[in-house]
Protein backbone atom coordinates (compact mmCIF):
# COMPACT_ATOMS: atom_id res chain seq x y z
CA UNK A 1 0.00 0.00 0.00
CA UNK A 2 1.19 3.53 -0.81
CA UNK A 3 -0.80 5.56 1.74
CA UNK A 4 -1.48 5.04 5.47
CA UNK A 5 -5.18 5.71 4.87
CA UNK A 6 -5.50 2.69 2.59
CA UNK A 7 -5.31 0.25 5.50
CA UNK A 8 -8.00 2.08 7.48
CA UNK A 9 -10.22 2.23 4.42
CA UNK A 10 -9.80 -1.48 3.70
CA UNK A 11 -10.66 -2.28 7.33
CA UNK A 12 -13.85 -0.22 7.18
CA UNK A 13 -14.90 -1.83 3.91
CA UNK A 14 -14.15 -5.29 5.32
CA UNK A 15 -16.45 -4.51 8.25
CA UNK A 16 -19.10 -3.36 5.77
CA UNK A 17 -18.84 -6.60 3.80
CA UNK A 18 -19.25 -8.59 7.04
CA UNK A 19 -22.16 -6.51 8.28
CA UNK A 20 -20.19 -4.95 11.13
CA UNK A 21 -19.93 -1.36 9.93
CA UNK A 22 -21.98 1.68 10.84
CA UNK A 23 -22.51 4.93 8.98
CA UNK A 24 -23.69 8.24 10.37
CA UNK A 25 -26.74 10.06 9.11
CA UNK A 26 -24.54 13.08 8.45
CA UNK A 27 -22.35 11.06 6.08
CA UNK A 28 -25.39 9.59 4.33
CA UNK A 29 -26.83 13.07 3.86
CA UNK A 30 -23.51 14.38 2.57
CA UNK A 31 -23.21 11.57 0.01
CA UNK A 32 -26.79 12.20 -1.06
CA UNK A 33 -26.18 15.93 -1.44
CA UNK A 34 -23.03 15.37 -3.50
CA UNK A 35 -24.85 12.96 -5.82
CA UNK A 36 -27.83 15.32 -6.08
CA UNK A 37 -25.53 18.19 -7.02
CA UNK A 38 -23.86 15.96 -9.62
CA UNK A 39 -27.20 14.98 -11.18
CA UNK A 40 -28.22 18.62 -11.36
CA UNK A 41 -24.88 19.58 -12.87
CA UNK A 42 -24.78 16.79 -15.44
CA UNK A 43 -28.43 16.73 -16.50
CA UNK A 44 -29.80 20.15 -15.66
CA UNK A 45 -27.20 22.56 -16.99
CA UNK A 46 -28.87 23.13 -20.36
CA UNK A 47 -26.31 23.77 -23.09
CA UNK A 48 -23.05 22.01 -22.27
CA UNK A 49 -20.97 24.27 -24.47
CA UNK A 50 -19.35 27.08 -22.54
CA UNK A 51 -17.08 29.87 -23.67
CA UNK A 52 -13.52 28.60 -23.85
CA UNK A 53 -11.18 29.48 -21.04
CA UNK A 54 -8.23 27.92 -19.29
CA UNK A 55 -9.13 26.14 -16.07
CA UNK A 56 -7.27 23.79 -13.76
CA UNK A 57 -9.24 20.94 -15.31
CA UNK A 58 -7.97 21.56 -18.85
CA UNK A 59 -4.66 23.43 -18.62
CA UNK A 60 -2.71 20.19 -18.42
CA UNK A 61 -4.00 19.03 -21.81
CA UNK A 62 -1.89 19.18 -25.00
CA UNK A 63 -1.88 22.65 -26.55
CA UNK A 64 -3.02 21.32 -29.93
CA UNK A 65 -6.20 20.01 -28.33
CA UNK A 66 -6.74 23.29 -26.50
CA UNK A 67 -6.33 25.16 -29.79
CA UNK A 68 -9.21 23.19 -31.28
CA UNK A 69 -11.34 23.67 -28.17
CA UNK A 70 -10.77 27.41 -28.45
CA UNK A 71 -11.02 27.89 -32.21
CA UNK A 72 -13.03 25.00 -33.65
CA UNK A 73 -15.12 23.44 -30.88
CA UNK A 74 -17.77 22.42 -33.41
CA UNK A 75 -15.34 19.92 -34.93
CA UNK A 76 -15.17 17.80 -31.79
CA UNK A 77 -16.45 14.26 -32.09
CA UNK A 78 -19.99 13.99 -30.70
CA UNK A 79 -20.20 12.45 -27.27
CA UNK A 80 -21.96 9.06 -27.15
CA UNK A 81 -25.10 8.79 -25.04
CA UNK A 82 -23.12 6.61 -22.64
CA UNK A 83 -21.02 9.67 -21.79
CA UNK A 84 -23.58 10.96 -19.29
CA UNK A 85 -23.72 7.71 -17.33
CA UNK A 86 -19.93 7.52 -17.39
CA UNK A 87 -19.68 11.00 -15.90
CA UNK A 88 -22.29 10.16 -13.27
CA UNK A 89 -20.42 7.00 -12.33
CA UNK A 90 -17.36 9.12 -11.63
CA UNK A 91 -19.37 11.56 -9.53
CA UNK A 92 -21.03 8.78 -7.54
CA UNK A 93 -17.72 7.02 -6.94
CA UNK A 94 -16.18 10.25 -5.63
CA UNK A 95 -19.13 10.96 -3.33
CA UNK A 96 -19.21 7.45 -1.84
CA UNK A 97 -15.41 7.31 -1.61
CA UNK A 98 -15.32 10.49 0.47
CA UNK A 99 -18.09 9.09 2.65
CA UNK A 100 -16.11 5.91 3.21
CA UNK A 101 -13.03 7.96 4.11
CA UNK A 102 -15.08 9.82 6.71
CA UNK A 103 -16.50 6.68 8.28
CA UNK A 104 -13.07 5.03 8.29
CA UNK A 105 -11.87 7.86 10.52
CA UNK A 106 -9.59 9.41 7.91
CA UNK A 107 -9.40 13.17 8.36
CA UNK A 108 -9.45 15.20 5.16
CA UNK A 109 -10.28 18.67 3.94
CA UNK A 110 -12.35 19.55 0.89
CA UNK A 111 -11.97 22.58 -1.34
CA UNK A 112 -15.04 24.74 -0.84
CA UNK A 113 -13.79 27.73 -2.81
CA UNK A 114 -11.78 27.72 -6.07
CA UNK A 115 -8.04 28.17 -5.72
CA UNK A 116 -6.15 30.48 -8.09
CA UNK A 117 -2.84 29.93 -9.86
CA UNK A 118 -1.10 33.05 -11.15
CA UNK A 119 0.56 32.66 -14.54
CA UNK A 120 2.12 35.12 -16.97
CA UNK A 121 -1.15 35.40 -18.89
CA UNK A 122 -3.45 35.76 -15.90
CA UNK A 123 -5.10 33.57 -13.30
CA UNK A 124 -6.33 30.00 -13.66
CA UNK A 125 -8.87 28.70 -11.15
CA UNK A 126 -10.13 25.32 -10.08
CA UNK A 127 -11.41 23.21 -7.20
CA UNK A 128 -9.41 20.24 -5.97
CA UNK A 129 -10.99 17.10 -4.50
CA UNK A 130 -9.42 16.74 -1.06
CA UNK A 131 -6.38 17.23 1.16
CA UNK A 132 -5.02 14.51 3.46
CA UNK A 133 -2.06 15.18 5.75
CA UNK A 134 -1.40 18.50 4.04
CA UNK A 135 -1.20 17.04 0.52
CA UNK A 136 -3.62 17.62 -2.35
CA UNK A 137 -5.19 14.42 -3.68
CA UNK A 138 -7.47 13.77 -6.64
CA UNK A 139 -10.13 11.05 -6.85
CA UNK A 140 -10.38 9.27 -10.20
CA UNK A 141 -12.61 6.49 -11.47
CA UNK A 142 -10.89 4.47 -14.18
CA UNK A 143 -11.56 1.70 -16.64
CA UNK A 144 -9.97 -1.65 -15.89
CA UNK A 145 -7.31 -1.03 -18.55
CA UNK A 146 -6.44 2.43 -17.23
CA UNK A 147 -6.40 1.16 -13.66
CA UNK A 148 -3.90 -1.58 -14.52
CA UNK A 149 -1.78 0.31 -17.05
CA UNK A 150 -2.05 4.10 -16.90
CA UNK A 151 -2.41 4.26 -13.11
CA UNK A 152 0.16 1.57 -12.42
CA UNK A 153 2.52 4.21 -11.03
CA UNK A 154 3.33 7.90 -11.27
CA UNK A 155 5.82 7.18 -14.02
CA UNK A 156 3.30 5.33 -16.22
CA UNK A 157 0.73 8.08 -15.69
CA UNK A 158 3.21 10.84 -16.46
CA UNK A 159 4.43 9.07 -19.59
CA UNK A 160 0.98 8.88 -21.17
CA UNK A 161 -0.81 11.81 -19.53
CA UNK A 162 -2.91 13.05 -22.45
CA UNK A 163 -5.64 14.19 -20.03
CA UNK A 164 -3.24 16.40 -18.08
CA UNK A 165 -3.74 14.84 -14.65
CA UNK A 166 -0.17 15.53 -13.49
CA UNK A 167 -0.28 19.19 -14.48
CA UNK A 168 -3.70 19.54 -12.90
CA UNK A 169 -2.48 18.16 -9.57
CA UNK A 170 0.62 20.36 -9.68
CA UNK A 171 -1.53 23.40 -10.36
CA UNK A 172 -3.83 22.67 -7.44
CA UNK A 173 -0.88 22.12 -5.11
CA UNK A 174 0.90 25.30 -6.19
CA UNK A 175 -2.25 27.40 -6.00
CA UNK A 176 -3.20 26.14 -2.54
CA UNK A 177 0.32 26.29 -1.13
CA UNK A 178 0.23 22.59 -0.26
CA UNK A 179 2.15 19.49 -1.25
CA UNK A 180 1.18 17.41 -4.28
CA UNK A 181 -0.14 14.13 -2.91
CA UNK A 182 -1.42 11.80 -5.59
CA UNK A 183 -4.48 10.03 -6.94
CA UNK A 184 -7.06 7.79 -5.30
CA UNK A 185 -8.11 5.57 -8.19
CA UNK A 186 -11.20 3.35 -8.23
CA UNK A 187 -11.61 0.62 -10.84
CA UNK A 188 -15.11 1.01 -12.30
CA UNK A 189 -15.10 -2.62 -13.47
CA UNK A 190 -14.63 -4.33 -10.11
CA UNK A 191 -14.47 -1.74 -7.33
CA UNK A 192 -10.76 -2.17 -6.60
CA UNK A 193 -9.00 0.96 -5.43
CA UNK A 194 -5.46 2.14 -4.78
CA UNK A 195 -3.41 5.22 -4.10
CA UNK A 196 -0.91 6.37 -6.70
CA UNK A 197 1.52 8.83 -5.08
CA UNK A 198 3.02 11.64 -7.13
CA UNK A 199 6.36 10.83 -5.56
CA UNK A 200 8.51 11.79 -8.54
CA UNK A 201 6.70 14.97 -9.50
CA UNK A 202 8.87 17.97 -10.36
CA UNK A 203 6.71 20.88 -9.26
CA UNK A 204 8.83 23.61 -10.84
CA UNK A 205 8.88 21.78 -14.15
CA UNK A 206 5.14 21.07 -14.13
CA UNK A 207 4.18 24.64 -13.24
CA UNK A 208 6.53 25.92 -15.95
CA UNK A 209 4.69 23.67 -18.42
CA UNK A 210 1.37 25.15 -17.33
CA UNK A 211 2.73 28.65 -17.86
CA UNK A 212 4.05 27.67 -21.30
CA UNK A 213 0.65 26.23 -22.18
CA UNK A 214 -1.08 29.45 -21.16
CA UNK A 215 1.30 31.51 -23.30
CA UNK A 216 0.79 29.22 -26.31
CA UNK A 217 -2.99 29.37 -25.97
CA UNK A 218 -2.88 33.17 -25.69
CA UNK A 219 -0.70 33.37 -28.82
CA UNK A 220 -3.29 31.17 -30.55
CA UNK A 221 -0.63 29.24 -32.45
CA UNK A 222 -1.42 25.73 -33.65
CA UNK A 223 1.27 23.09 -33.54
CA UNK A 224 0.80 19.36 -33.21
CA UNK A 225 2.20 18.03 -29.95
CA UNK A 226 2.55 14.46 -31.18
CA UNK A 227 4.15 12.90 -34.24
CA UNK A 228 2.87 9.76 -35.98
CA UNK A 229 4.34 6.55 -34.64
CA UNK A 230 6.18 4.04 -36.81
CA UNK A 231 4.18 0.85 -37.19
CA UNK A 232 6.11 -2.30 -36.38
CA UNK A 233 5.32 -5.97 -36.93
CA UNK A 234 7.29 -8.64 -35.12
CA UNK A 235 9.86 -6.05 -34.14
CA UNK A 236 10.39 -4.64 -37.62
CA UNK A 237 9.06 -1.37 -39.10
CA UNK A 238 6.42 -1.83 -41.79
CA UNK A 239 7.02 1.50 -43.51
CA UNK A 240 3.62 2.76 -42.39
CA UNK A 241 2.87 5.28 -39.66
CA UNK A 242 -0.02 5.23 -37.20
CA UNK A 243 -1.74 7.66 -34.86
CA UNK A 244 0.29 8.52 -31.77
CA UNK A 245 -1.03 7.08 -28.51
CA UNK A 246 -1.27 10.62 -27.17
CA UNK A 247 -3.96 11.36 -29.77
CA UNK A 248 -6.16 8.29 -29.35
CA UNK A 249 -8.68 9.89 -26.98
CA UNK A 250 -8.61 13.38 -28.51
CA UNK A 251 -12.02 14.54 -29.76
CA UNK A 252 -10.32 16.43 -32.60
CA UNK A 253 -8.10 13.69 -33.99
CA UNK A 254 -9.98 13.49 -37.31
CA UNK A 255 -9.69 17.24 -37.87
CA UNK A 256 -6.04 17.29 -36.84
CA UNK A 257 -5.22 14.33 -39.12
CA UNK A 258 -7.68 14.71 -42.04
CA UNK A 259 -5.95 12.03 -44.12
CA UNK A 260 -6.08 9.43 -41.36
CA UNK A 261 -7.53 6.08 -42.43
CA UNK A 262 -8.96 3.57 -39.97
CA UNK A 263 -8.76 0.02 -41.24
CA UNK A 264 -7.78 -3.48 -40.13
CA UNK A 265 -4.09 -3.85 -39.33
CA UNK A 266 -2.21 -4.34 -42.60
CA UNK A 267 0.54 -6.68 -41.36
CA UNK A 268 -1.69 -8.69 -39.01
CA UNK A 269 -2.34 -12.31 -39.89
CA UNK A 270 -5.18 -12.70 -37.40
CA UNK A 271 -8.65 -13.72 -38.56
CA UNK A 272 -10.04 -10.51 -37.10
CA UNK A 273 -7.23 -7.92 -37.16
CA UNK A 274 -7.50 -4.98 -34.81
CA UNK A 275 -8.50 -1.63 -36.30
CA UNK A 276 -5.55 0.72 -36.72
CA UNK A 277 -5.53 4.47 -37.38
CA UNK A 278 -3.06 4.92 -40.24
CA UNK A 279 -1.53 8.32 -40.94
CA UNK A 280 0.56 7.21 -43.91
CA UNK A 281 0.58 3.91 -45.80
CA UNK A 282 3.58 3.03 -47.93
CA UNK A 283 3.08 -0.72 -48.01
CA UNK A 284 -0.31 -2.36 -48.55
CA UNK A 285 0.94 -5.93 -48.22
CA UNK A 286 3.55 -7.56 -46.02
Question: Over which residues does each language-model region extend?
Answer:
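Residue-level recognition of conserved beta-strand positions in structured domain cores
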Residues: 139-141, 185
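Long, contiguous hydrophobic alpha-helical segments, chiefly transmembrane helices and signal peptides
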Residues: 137-139, 171
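Generic hydrophobic secondary-structure signal
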Residues: 66-68, 97, 101, 169, ...
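Metal-dependent nuclease catalytic cores that hydrolyze phosphodiester bonds in DNA/RNA
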Residues: 1-136, 143-154, 159
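Metal-dependent nuclease catalytic regions and adjoining charged, substrate-binding loops involved
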Residues: 159-161, 171, 175-286
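Short, well-structured alpha-helical interface segments that form or flank functional binding sites
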Residues: 92, 96, 125, 164-171, ...
Amino acid sequence: MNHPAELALHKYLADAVNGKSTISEATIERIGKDVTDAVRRQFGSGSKRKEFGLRMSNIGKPTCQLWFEKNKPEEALPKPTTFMFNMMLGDIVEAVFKGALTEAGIAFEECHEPVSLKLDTGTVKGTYDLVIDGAVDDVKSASDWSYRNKFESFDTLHKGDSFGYVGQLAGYAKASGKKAGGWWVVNKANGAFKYVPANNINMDEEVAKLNSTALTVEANEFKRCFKPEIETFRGHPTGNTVLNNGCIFCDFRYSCWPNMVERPSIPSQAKEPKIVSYITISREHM
